[in-house]
């Protein structure tokens, strides 16, 4: 395995709360996938949920080395939890196309939050062919 990219992001949760207060659900609609949106709508802590998703998606965009531009959008990165509760990343659209082009075979996600901050790190790996 070879590391293709590493990205980290930290989000101040109060900043997400301020944006939601000013513009309603517009940020959530821009950031969340359809599956994440369904969870956000009924989540007990929607601001914290959105902040954590935002941190993972920013970290992923940094790991890809692109940021959110050139056809990539936040909602093309979907954060979900596996059967053990571990955060995972699913890609759609241009994000998936880019991952395939780069030869990404595995994505590692770590996510943490405390009272004021949410932090995420994403590592992209590629399988090295013997030769």
UniProtKB/Swiss-Prot annotation:
Pfam families associated with the record: ACPS
Residues noted as binding Mg(2+) in the record, renumbered to the chain: 9, 58
Lipid metabolism listed as a keyword: yes
Listed GO biological process terms: fatty acid biosynthetic process
Record-annotated disulphide pairs: none
Subcellular localization, as worded in the UniProt entry: Cytoplasm
Record has Zinc-finger as a keyword: no
Main location: cytoplasm
Enzyme Commission numbers on file: 2.7.8.7
Keywords, sorted A to Z: Cytoplasm, Fatty acid biosynthesis, Fatty acid metabolism, Lipid biosynthesis, Lipid metabolism, Magnesium, Metal-binding, Transferase
GO molecular function, one term: magnesium ion binding
Any Gene Ontology CC annotation: cytoplasm
Cofactor requirements of the protein: Mg(2+)
Reaction equations catalysed: apo-[ACP] + CoA = holo-[ACP] + adenosine 3',5'-bisphosphate + H(+)
Function (record text): Transfers the 4'-phosphopantetheine moiety from coenzyme A to a Ser of acyl-carrier-protein.
Family: Belongs to the P-Pant transferase superfamily. AcpS family.
Stated name of the protein: Holo-[acyl-carrier-protein] synthase
Naturally occurring in which organism (per UniProt): Salmonella arizonae (strain ATCC BAA-731 / CDC346-86 / RSK2980)
Gene of this entry: acpS
